[in-house]
Amino acid sequence: MFLNSLPTNFAALEVGQHLYWQIGNIRLHGQVFLTSWILLGALLVFISVGTKKMENDPKGLQNLLEFLWDYIRDLSRTQIGEKVYRDWMPFIGTLFLFVFVSNWGGALIPWRLIKLPSGELGAPTADINTTIALALLVSLSYFYAGLSNKGWRYFEYYVHPTPIMLPFKILEDFTKPLSLSFRLFGNILADELVVGVLVFLVPLVLPIPVMFLGLFTSAIQALIFATLAAYYIGEAVEEHH
């Protein structure tokens, strides 16, 4: 009976339609660029306003920004180590803030209500291409961290503590970006789908608590992504004895 009572166009509910940009033979997902530019622009304005008049007794936005700075500093120091964490703080902070504002932007802003000639907007991190690119960037970063700090000795990691570990360590280099990208993509996309279905079925009340849960999940996913990135870098620069 419940199934018969559903709207007849329920099957028309879609995950989303891409806004494509064609550059030569390359087709890009334009909605990722548009929403990323909007969110990054808003973040830059937020930071500019918060740091415009720095005070010894921070209040308001300056207080929030200093809290974020301290949090990212402590995260980097804990995961990477005292020796080189300062070199990687800007990278870890940028990752965290981009993923955070992308996730929250998808949870708070009704992108699909913005009408476009074709396609629709959505959270950048709800696109698998974005999360894979971020994960590959993390992989390149910990390779660079290991080689720049240890030189060719970095590859001793692959046979530590025994050469038997070599194939497993190589496999790990592939599973790290896969787990990073699919964890972030899956959680953000699932949240958008759940909210979309509930808005379709019960548009007034039921989606609100789910949206708050989505905000919490989005923040946790940004924290997990930044923490794992810092941990991988710390693992690469760690001296094995």
Curated annotation (Swiss-Prot):
Keyword Disulfide bond: no
Disulfide bonds: none
Keywords associated with the record: ATP synthesis, CF(0), Hydrogen ion transport, Ion transport, Membrane, Thylakoid, Transmembrane, Transmembrane helix, Transport
MF GO annotations: proton-transporting ATP synthase activity, rotational mechanism
SUPFAM superfamilies on file: F1F0 ATP synthase subunit A (SSF81336)
One GO cellular component term noted in the UniProt record for this chain: plasma membrane-derived thylakoid membrane
Membrane topology type: Multi-pass membrane protein
Repressor as UniProt keyword: no
Pfam families per record: ATP-synt_A (PF00119)
Annotated function: Key component of the proton channel; it plays a direct role in the translocation of protons across the membrane.
Family under the similarity heading: Belongs to the ATPase A chain family.
Subunit structure: F-type ATPases have 2 components, CF(1) - the catalytic core - and CF(0) - the membrane proton channel. CF(1) has five subunits: alpha(3), beta(3), gamma(1), delta(1), epsilon(1). CF(0) has four main subunits: a, b, b' and c.
HAMAP family per UniProt: ATP_synth_a_bact
Protein name (database record): ATP synthase subunit a
Organism this protein belongs to: Prochlorococcus marinus subsp. pastoris (strain CCMP1986 / NIES-2087 / MED4)
